[in-house]
Every structure is written in C-alpha cells, then in structure tokens.
Amino acid sequence: MPFPIDDLPAAIRTTKAVLRAAMPNRAPVFRALEGDIARQADAILTDRAQGRDTIPVLRFADIAADRVDPASLAALRTRGACVIRGVFDARQASDWNDEIAAYVEANRLDDKLARRAEDRYFGTLASSRPQIYGIYWSKPQIAARQSPALTQARVFLNRLWRAQSEGRVHFDPARAPAYADRIRRRPPGSSSLGLSPHVDGGSVERWLEPNYRRVYRHVLAGDWRAYDPFDAAFRPDVEEIPSPAVCSMFRTFQGWTALTPQGPGDGTLQLIPVANAMAYVVLRALQDDVPDDDLCGAQPGRALSVLPAWHAPLLAALVPIPPMEPGDAVFWHGDVVHAVEDAHRGTGYSNVMYIASAPGCAKNDAYLKRQLPSFLRGESPPDFPADHFETDFTGRARADDLSALGREQMGFGP
C-alpha cells in the first residue's frame, strides 16, 4: 500500500515532536549508541588493516551441506552482510555474461538508452548512478533466479531472520519469490558513475510511517540494545511513499551475483558492515541540533543518504567488498549502508545481476501479481522506470523458459 504525505515539513515537525517527547533522555541514549558504532567501526578497520575479512565470507558448499559454522553466522548477524563463494560455477556465470552481452547488442539496447525513462530514485546521491541497465527478462537472469542453488542460498538468508515474534508469523522463509531487477555492466575506465553511501527501502518513512516506527520500537523507546535488526516484526507491513524504483517487496537481503571478476578499485560495491546502523540513523535525526522539519536530509521517494554532516561515525566504517569471481554472490541486510565506487580503475568489465533475497508474505505475493503481467509482456516491472525496452527483444525469456520452481517464484500458482 502507498503511504501518501500531503505536507512533508508539517508531518516531520509533528512526528519529531512526539518522538522527542517520548524520549527526554535521547541525548545520553544517542551518545551511548554512538560509542557502540565507533567501537564497531574500529573493529572493522582493524580487521581490514590486519588482512581479515571485514565482510563474512561463506562457501555455498557449506550452505548446501548445512555446515556453516556458528562463528560465521554470528559475524553475519553483526556485520549484516556476507559474500557467498561459488553459488554458480565460474564458467556458467561467464557464459551468462556473454549471453547478456549478445542479447544487449543484438537488440541494440545502447541506441534505446538515449530514450530511457528518468530514474529519480538516485537523483540526490552525490555521483549520479552507475551503469545499470533496464534489462529484467534475459534468459540468464531467469535461469539464475530460478536456479536451485541460488534459491537455497536465499532460503538460508531468509532463515537468519526471526520470522515469528510478537505473537505473529511474519513470513515463510522457505519460499523465495523472484523480484525481477536489473543488470550492471560497467566498463573499465568509467568514472563519476558511482553511488554515494545510502540505504534503500524507505527514507522519511522510517520515522513517519507507523509500521516503520514499530520496526524501530526499541530504538525509539531509548532501548537500542534490545533492537534486533533481524526481527521481522512489522517489516512486511511497512508502506512506502509512491515513487519509481522504490522497492515494493520486503527483502531480507539485497544482493547481486558476479558475472565477471571484480573487487576493490573496480568500480564496485562498498558496505558499512554494521547491522544496527539504522538505529544510529534513526536516533541521529531526533537530536536537538537537527532542525525540527528535517530528518538529516532525508527526501521522500529517494534513497536515504548517509551524509558526512550527520553520520560521520558510520562513514568511517565504509569498506570495499572482497575480490569476487564469476558465480560468487554478495548480500547485505536492507538496513545496511552501501555505496558504489566512483571510478573503475580495473582492466575488465564489472558486471552483475541484481538478485535479492525475499521471503513469502502477503506483501510480496501482492507484488508478484503486479509483476507477472510485466514478465509476460516483456515490460519493465512495476517498481522500475517504465522503459519497457524488452517488449520486442529477440531472445527474451518467456513462460516456457520457467521451471516448475521458477513458475512458483514468479507467482503463477499451482
């Protein structure tokens, strides 16, 4: 459901007055939380300096064999992100990369990009947007989404969450509905095409929307230590301000799968691997040095920017993901701050397929019903700019390309 706001400054002033009144001790509470964030940032930077993983690295073979060690699981819950090695065979991923390149070239996508619809979602981020293409229905994307391996990885990630709490069952972790997303094809030498640090999945809604306030109920009550980023209570119930390219599904993790080798310096992903970072962002906006009608620069219908002026302790922990090989995947909690490097200083393309992890729930089922006609017609999905590039593309995936699992994940029903 959409969450409309008629007078944003008035809504912010009213909400902040209520939230501040409910937490008269917000200043010392925030100082304690800021100390926790600083300690986590120090640990992350120490790990990086000493050559240890700043982002937990798992092997898909261990997930498949149910032998991921408890220390890795604990690190994943603390850092809010992970790399999964070998979800796909490297040759398979490289072949998919070649197939997508041929699909793009055969259908003259570059000629059509000049007429693409405006993607306003990233408009306020410092460095424009990376080279992300409105391609959703290529056969490699369909094959990857419906693959048993990536499905098993997504179910594993879903199960890291508390799917039942507050006396309710919030979602079915065993289901992995397909959220159709785009591809990135970033050539070497490209610059000023990154994304500055931000969070997806809601900006001003995190303070203004009632269910989002319930998500952060412990934080807003001053008990941030009781806040569990992996408690799913109320998350599938949140409502977003209507906007192109704002995700309408509840994702347990955002993610992408590498199609080419890439790593630090290759114009790829950076993370602030702090799972409880949003507690800091939420409380920061309620401090007395922030104007009454401002939420640290948050804008409706946009990515939630994390800015040096307001969030410097968090930004200290921004680190690159480790080197990735074709077939590896990276996933990060929806509240984890992420960015994309401005410059690609490497020698090869940094190409990925965006494939997130999402569970079965009413919110996601409702989106599948809206997304399915887009697939059948080859149109851009409802959440994305209405480019509709693929309607007449040769080689586009069709319903016949779906496996039984793929049909279920797309919402075809029995």
Give the predicted meaning of each segment:
Residues 1-78, 395-414:
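Fe(II)/2-oxoglutarate
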Residues 17, 24, 42, 46-49, ...:
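Generic surface-pattern signal
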Residues 18, 22, 36, 99, ...:
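Residues that form generic nucleotide/phosphate-binding pockets
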Residues 71, 76-79, 88-322, 341-347, ...:
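Non-heme Fe(II) oxygenase catalytic core, chiefly the N-lobe of the double-stranded beta-helix
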Residues 82:
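Beta-strand-loop-alpha-helix segment that lines the small-molecule cofactor/substrate pocket
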